[in-house]
């Protein structure tokens, strides 16, 4: 009997890079993880690790009883003691729970944390979205400064850039403060009531519970109705408007492309004030690569003090899918092609010398013919093939083939000469 992976999941494995999806390639995972970890270090963030399952009530309290996560997507189970637990559908709630449980609010504020790990949502499988997906995220707790918002957006943008995502634009909105919502929500609710018969069932249910979330509807009829709805930007309090201006000025100062999107609300109930999405047109209609926002009441909601927070999450699968549209970096710097048995040991010595200088190299250990070795060099995604045979050994050089152009040239000077030719 044979077994297959569960629906909505995938494997990461060494294979034919040209045939694999980006998220199936361990080399791309490693590159993204290393780049993100280095950026977090440079921005002053410390790693936090929380369990992959928590009390289910934690996610109900944080994301909201009416959120799609709670109503449709959580993997919920009971342990032997009868406690209701859930596989984590997102990262923020667990990090905030840890912040409160361990008294991190007693430390010098803000506390800046990052995480990397699997999340679980029982949702319809589609390109770049899975029931188990891996998220890179960051949370900053203990500061309401708008420049913190700018830093968080800049960090997300930098991670995506380091992975090769291009043409990215930040969509930005502000969901206001208590004063803003006191003025805006009744107006929006009255508008929705007038169009109740034209809305999808989920949006009708949200009229009372959280009318702002109707802007998150994917139903075409509802979206058509909402094009005429009042927008929150017209109702922002002076304080909320000033916060938004400061964030915009910060993004402009850093040269980060953004647009105001007054219909952007995000899909979780805990968001307040700043919300944002990083979008890239290379993904088509489902163009969001990462997103986040402020949750200034969540810490208190989960039993802690009145402490503001902001964060983001970005799916590894979405990032790698978006990055594929850019010119990908080669997975391998050099593949050594040996034309005779006598060339194998010198090839190994050269490869080891290049590895010591930081280059990635491979040799043939499967006894392939020279033609088969060239095919393997092509499949591996190597930038160059380094050819060694009797002529090269007797002449004290190697033949370097550019795998993209097919151009060949002789390279002498031993390991140093080869390093200069490959690395520049």
From Swiss-Prot:
Reactions catalysed, as given in the entry: tRNA(His) + L-histidine + ATP = L-histidyl-tRNA(His) + AMP + diphosphate + H(+)
GO MF annotation terms: ATP binding; histidine-tRNA ligase activity
Signal peptide range: none
Stored Pfam families: HGTP_anticodon, tRNA-synt_His
Enzyme Commission code(s) on record: 6.1.1.21
InterPro entries: aa-tRNA-synth_II, aa-tRNA-synth_II/BPL/LPL, Anticodon-bd, Anticodon-bd_dom_sf, His-tRNA-ligase, HisRS-like_core, HisRS/HisZ, HisRS_anticodon
Keywords annotated in UniProt: Aminoacyl-tRNA synthetase, ATP-binding, Cytoplasm, Ligase, Nucleotide-binding, Protein biosynthesis
UniProt similarity note: Belongs to the class-II aminoacyl-tRNA synthetase family.
Name of the protein described by the UniProt record: Histidine--tRNA ligase
Lineage: Bacteria, Bacillati, Actinomycetota, Rubrobacteria, Rubrobacterales
